[in-house]
Swiss-Prot record:
Substrate binds at W56, S115, L116, F182, G183, L184, L185, Q186, H274. This is Biotin biosynthesis bifunctional protein BioHC. Residues 288-558 are annotated as: Malonyl-ACP O-methyltransferase. Keywords: Biotin biosynthesis, Hydrolase, Methyltransferase, Multifunctional enzyme, S-adenosyl-L-methionine, Transferase. The gene is bioC. Converts the free carboxyl group of a malonyl-thioester to its methyl ester by transfer of a methyl group from S-adenosyl-L-methionine (SAM). It allows to synthesize pimeloyl-ACP via the fatty acid synthetic pathway.
Length: 558
């Protein structure tokens, strides 16, 4: 995850009433919930509709800054919850609200919710999965939405229960004053606090006397919802965004949510408070769009390594040898360590000490499952998170050390990787990692190129490419790291023929996942031509070599 810096943004000048609308709501239920439908100029009928659900004390107006960023790229529906905005529906439970919203959703949806609205997303997703087989939620994106709003039942990454109870009691006595104080809390901890406060005053309306009772009821929903079990059961993809300075939903919730379901992606947005979409709308829009339109190769990397997880250790002797070297570089005094790209958990097991807390992170859920099984078999604790090294779901200044063995080469954005690593490390924390250089697999790359020329099929990408190690060092320094130690090594594996070489690459998940790869099976003629071309590398000892260029690095955050 990139370290999200505060944007220089102005208060939104959107007046939702002036935005062109799509067709009017057709049913009574739609008329109650849908405040606005906003169609882009060039609408793609196959694209998902983005549906937004606001939080307590707000209305559809809260999304104005994000609408400004997204309106040209997707169709948008803005909903009002019962007794908020223009929705006068009387609904007596969160599950009933979720059922209503599920009924009115279009066939293909990206569902976005903030605070209470975000806590409703798992309930809505459950409704769709269980009762609406013709509808799909392609992504759920929660902003400042915890699994449980207040502490209790062994969940501590939330607002203290006493604080929440006091707030509810104060609202019952003096709703208007309490709502005003709530606005101050929403802006607290945000580097754009003044901007957020102005936006709250402009876009959030205080409750009217006839709304007091319904808003009090909505507060009880906020305290009653506990999505911990549901988040484990639903299959809809989730992205959870949290503000680093949020005074209502602590940033620690990111780790807690990742622990509930390691397949969900979580992200802590630096310098943001509770109303992330007021503070940094451009950045939040960018994050959401990137999630929904994620590059295919990342998904292919995850799938490739997930498929390899069960057999990976049987052929990963080089990877384990390199991991042993890496672990020797980790400071003994490091107590809180994150293993980035943990694979089957080899590094984590080597680093385990009674006094250490180790967090294992991987993009491939299959690898995490294998790592968890290995740890439990050794009666060791396991904390696993399914996430991208470029999008770390951790708070700032939290780790003594980061370890990453042979994973960095799969990242697309090295500046983001090092920026994130620098953010989550404590001062004087260290990042120790190994990665592959461009000489890696050069024999296979050249053999395929020669075969393609012979068969008149130039331009195909058969072998993963790796960046120059000098560029790795430059990116690390630009992020603020000092390079304490570095080493470059060449390792050569040998094989009797090409086929076991290819099978081994597939078994460890390191076969081609680059853009430009031809789809479908590789024909026998092409494999034969490649094998013949590879023969030029056969050594005097009668074996075929396969080269790995490896860089080791120890970085210091100063």
């Amino acid at each position: 995850m990139s370290n999200i810096e505060p944007s220089n943004v102005k208060p939104s000048n959107i007046e939702l009433g002036t935005i062109p609308l799509a067709e009017a709501p057709a049913t009574k239920l739609e008329a109650a919930y849908i405040a606005k439908k906003i169609a882009p100029n060039n609408s793609n009928p196959n694209a998902p509709v983005w549906v937004f659900v606001h939080g307590w004390g707000a209305s559809a107006n809260t999304w104005a800054p994000l609408v400004d960023e997204l309106k040209s790229q997707c169709e948008i529906w803005l909903l009002d919850l019962p007794s908020f905005g223009g929705n006068t529906q009387a609904v007596n439970s969160p599950s009933a609200v979720a059922a209503d919203i599920a009924k009115i959703l279009p066939a293909n949806t990206v569902l976005v919710g903030w605070s209470l609205g975000g806590m409703l997303l798992p309930l809505i997703a459950q409704q769709i999965e269980q009762h609406w087989p013709t509808k799909t939620i392609s992504h759920c994106i929660g902003l400042a939405a915890n699994a449980k709003f207040a502490q209790g039942d062994n969940y501590t990454a939330a607002m203290p229960a006493e604080t929440f109870q006091t707030f509810c009691a104060n609202f019952n006595v003096d709703p208007t004053t309490t709502w005003s104080r709530f606005g101050l809390l929403q802006a607290q901890g945000d580097s754009n606090r003044k901007l957020v406060s102005r936006q709250i005053k402009a876009l959030h309306n205080a409750p009217m006397p006839e709304q007091f009772t319904a808003w009090q009821q909505a507060l009880t929903w906020l305290g009653a919802i506990d999505n911990r079990v549901l988040l484990c059961e639903i299959t809809t993809p989730f992205l959870h965004l949290f503000g680093e300075g949020d005074a209502l939903v602590p940033a620690d919730a990111a780790v807690a949510m990742a622990g509930i379901n390691p397949l969900h992606q979580t992200l802590v947005v630096a310098s943001a408070g509770h109303v992330l979409h007021f503070s940094q709308p451009a950045k939040i829009a960018q994050i959401m769009l990137a999630r929904v339109h994620a590059k295919r190769n990342k998904a292919r990397v995850a799938k490739s390594f997930s498929n390899a997880a069960t057999e990976y250790d049987s052929v990963a002797y080089l990877q384990q040898k390199l991991a042993n070297t890496l672990c020797e570089w980790v400071p003994e005094q490091a107590e809180k360590i994150a293993d980035l790209g943990c694979g089957t958990g080899y590094c984590g097991l080597q680093l385990q000490r009674p006094e250490r807390d180790i967090y294992s992170l991987d993009l491939a859920q299959g690898m995490l499952h294998t790592a968890r099984s290995k740890a439990l078999a050794k009666q060791q604790l396991f904390s696993g998170v399914c996430a991208d090294i470029e999008c770390l779901p951790f708070i700032s200044n939290g780790f003594d050390a980061l370890v990453s063995g042979m994973s960095m080469q799969w990242c697309e954005d090295l500046p983001a990787v090092f920026s994130e690593a620098h953010r989550v490390l404590k001062p004087n924390g260290e990042m120790i990692f190994s990665t592959l250089g461009p000489q890696t697999l050069f024999e296979l790359r050249e053999a395929w190129a020669e075969a393609d020329i012979k068969l008149g099929r130039q331009g195909c990408v058969h072998v993963n490419t790796f960046i120059e190690l000098d560029r790795v060092e430059i990116a690390a320094k630009q992020a603020g790291f000092v390079i304490e130690q570095t080493s470059r090594e060449i390792h050569v594996l040998t094989y009797d023929s090409v086929m076991p070489l290819m099978r081994e690459l597939k078994t460890i998940g390191a076969h081609n996942v680059n853009p430009g790869q031809e789809q479908g099976l590789t024909g026998k003629a092409r494999l034969k031509a490649m094998a013949q071309a590879y023969e030029q590398f056969r050594t005097a000892q009668g074996v075929l070599p396969l080269t790995y260029e490896v860089g080791f690095y120890q970085l210091l955050k100063v």
